[in-house]
Amino acid sequence: VIDNSIIQATSSWPFVEARKLVKERQKIYEKKGKITLQTGYGPSGLPHIGTFAEVARTTMMVNAIKQIIDIPTEIITFSDDMDGLRKIPDNVPNREILEKNLHKPLTSVPDPFKKYKSFGEHNNEMLKKFLNEFKFNYIFKSSTDTYKKGLFNTALLLVLEKYEQIKEAVLPTLGKERQKTYSPFLP
């Protein structure tokens, strides 16, 4: 355990950000009884150094939080595996499988490695293996599984209820062409 005077004085970014989070989000974590941080993964390609860096930075934040406050923490690594396959990565076999499935959700695209049900599942498993090799402590969640379990239903209903307000807020931030097709349900 690091001396509290050092924790409060350091300008090391994980501690600076952790101090802000602990101060600004106190009501939330006291209500929930824990602090949850999240990383995101777009499984249209294999995990890489950027994936590692995001989880490493988040882990540094968790470690700093643990020095500041005695509260349970967790990291959720969330895979956006319902994203559409926009392009074919250079480092995959059986490219013709992917060519036939462009723009489909990654968990609906067959695995070109022929090891899993889908390309999304393959890359999710590669991510978990990658993170486990570095002994990261995380909870894995899949967009596909979360949708199928209905865990987004409340939020989706709220988006539907606030549809026009959301569009009014977002449309001015988009280019003219994107403004024509934007929907909160199809960002």
Where are these predicted regions, by residue range?
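Non-catalytic terminal extensions that flank enzyme cores
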Residues: V1-I49, N63, Q67-T77, D90-H103, ...
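The substrate-binding groove and active-site-proximal loops of carbohydrate-active enzymes
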Residues: S5-Q8, P43-F52, P105-S118, T144-K148
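Glycine-rich, histidine-containing beta strand-loop boundary motifs that form or position
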Residues: T39-Y41, T77-S79, F134, S142-T144
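Active/ligand-binding-proximal structured segments within catalytic/core domains
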Residues: G50-M61
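Amphipathic alpha-helical segments that form well-ordered structural scaffolds
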Residues: M60, A64, H122-E133, L158, ...
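Short, solvent-exposed beta-strand-terminating loops
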Residues: D80-P89
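A glycine-rich helix N-cap at a beta->alpha junction
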Residues: N94-F134
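Active-site cores that bind ATP or allylic diphosphates and position pyrophosphate for catalysis
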Residues: N132, F136-P187
